[in-house]
């Protein structure tokens, strides 16, 4: 098995879907390792646009089998709704190429209700979650009271565990806008439909151990990782390389490439420190030109310049063998483009490659910038590296040097599927 892993390098929304879609054309198997329907990315295929949340984007390739792995949390209504939407848009037979690990956990509507209550309690220090219930679901998993997908098939066990969850949250919060009887009734119907999708993950993966191309699709991004991200302003799963290996029982020696997807500038959704954020005309321009609204929530993304410190930190943890730089065309009309190359910490210390663990310290860092000349010409749809303006190439090569020579192998130059430069 030759494994390619695609990971987000910043705070998500880097555009992982397009490179995953491209690589899936040659893949036998595409796997999601972590996260749930809080993730979101868009693939433009011909005249159709597909929005993905919990389903692997390998479904766009008619020859690719897809797995939702053990590290994920699955909101069953969203699974069926998303699958139906894809099939309605012409992806016939998608339902025959998607499987769910029996060890993945179930994200209930109950978790979404609890998510909102927990955020409200935090007041001004709220995390800024998607409100999808992901955090409470992973909390139940860690506390060993969660419900696994495979347990849906055992009606008595499933009912006992869901009632226990409901009772526990009512003891904590009082009355909830949630009806456990209605949920149990819904799952009577889901139980009949889910059976063909649920698999023993290890046995399933063993069937593909000799597959030449297996693709692992990361969700969210390294800076949202539970351990390595800007905690507590993170998601509740392991979104980096380690999480992919753990969730899918990967043999590390089978990994042939680790692709870091990095936007040509930086964005973030929700609360938390963002050193290179631009609360000015430059930030507004990045937001407007880049159409920076979340696929899952529709929220306006915060925007800032490319942060080399953040990306060096991300590289040190995820060990990228190549990069996909996305949305280069968004920078086309800037006279000057800034790159954050160092942080000055509150105590005066200068750092180029580490992120303070304390979010309050990170919020107070001063960013040292290098200013590069813009190219002031249209790059949308450019497909050959040599056809890019000289200053655009200089920008890309500056990023490569700043990240220790990790090659920028792919460059996104627009939203369409073929708006991609591949540098061999």
From Swiss-Prot:
The keyword GTP-binding applies. Pathway: Purine metabolism; AMP biosynthesis via de novo pathway; AMP from IMP: step 1/2. GO terms for molecular function: adenylosuccinate synthase activity; AMP binding; GMP binding; GTP binding; magnesium ion binding. GO terms for cellular component: cytoplasm. Substrate binds at residues 295-301. The active site is at 13 (proton acceptor), 41 (proton donor). Its cofactor is Mg(2+). GTP binds at residues 12-18, 40-42, 301, 327-329, 412-414. It catalyses: IMP + L-aspartate + GTP = N(6)-(1,2-dicarboxyethyl)-AMP + GDP + phosphate + 2 H(+). It is an enzyme of class 6 (ligase). It comes from the Eukaryota. NCBIfam families: PRK01117.1 (NF002223), purA (TIGR00184). Belongs to the adenylosuccinate synthetase family. Homodimer. This is Adenylosuccinate synthetase. It comes from Aspergillus niger (strain ATCC MYA-4892 / CBS 513.88 / FGSC A1513).
């Amino acid at each position: 098995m030759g494994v390619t892993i695609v990971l987000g390098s910043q705070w998500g929304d880097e555009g992982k879907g397009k490179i995953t879609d491209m690589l899936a054309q040659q893949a036998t198997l595409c796997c999601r390792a972590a996260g749930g329907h809080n993730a979101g990315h868009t693939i433009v295929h011909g005249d159709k646009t597909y929005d993905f949340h919990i389903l692997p984007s390998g479904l766009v390739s008619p020859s690719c089998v897809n797995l939702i792995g053990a590290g994920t949390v699955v909101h069953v209504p969203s699974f069926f709704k998303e699958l139906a939407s894809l099939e309605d848009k012409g992806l016939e037979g998608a339902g025959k190429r998607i499987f769910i690990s029996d060890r993945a956990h179930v994200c209930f509507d109950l978790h979404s209700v609890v998510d909102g209550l927990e955020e409200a309690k935090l007041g001004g220090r709220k995390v800024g979650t998607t409100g999808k219930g992901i955090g409470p679901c992973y909390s139940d998993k860690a506390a060993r009271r969660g419900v696994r997908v495979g347990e849906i098939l055992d009606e008595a066990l499933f009912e006992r565990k869901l009632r226990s969850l409901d009772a526990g949250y009512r003891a904590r919060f009082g009355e909830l806008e949630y009806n456990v009887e209605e949920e149990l009734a819904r799952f009577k119907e889901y139980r009949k439909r889910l059976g063909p999708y649920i698999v023993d993950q290890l046995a399933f993966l063993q069937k593909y151990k000799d597959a030449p191309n297996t693709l692992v699709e990361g969700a969210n991004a390294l800076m949202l990782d539970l351990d390595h991200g800007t905690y507590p302003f993170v998601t509740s799963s392991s979104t980096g390389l380690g999480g992919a290996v753990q969730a899918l029982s990967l043999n590390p020696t089978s990994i042939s490439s680790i692709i870091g997807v990095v936007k040509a500038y930086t964005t973030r959704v929700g609360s938390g420190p963002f050193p290179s954020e631009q609360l000015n005309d430059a930030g507004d321009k990045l937001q407007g030109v880049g159409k920076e609204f979340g696929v899952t929530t529709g929220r306006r993304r915060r925007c800032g310049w490319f942060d080399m410190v953040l990306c060096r930190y991300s590289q040190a943890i995820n060990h990228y063998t190549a990069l996909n730089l996305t949305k280069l065309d968004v920078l086309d009309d800037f006279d000057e483009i800034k790159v954050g190359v160092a942080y000055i910490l509150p105590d005066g210390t200068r750092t180029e490659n580490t992120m303070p663990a304390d979010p309050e310290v990170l919020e107070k860092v001063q960013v040292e910038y290098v200013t590069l000349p813009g190219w002031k010409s249209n790059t949308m749809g450019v497909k050959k590296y040599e056809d890019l303006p000289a200053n655009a190439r200089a920008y890309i090569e500056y990023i490569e040097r700043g990240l220790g020579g990790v090659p920028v192998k792919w460059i996104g130059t627009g939203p369409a599927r073929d708006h991609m430069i591949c540098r061999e």
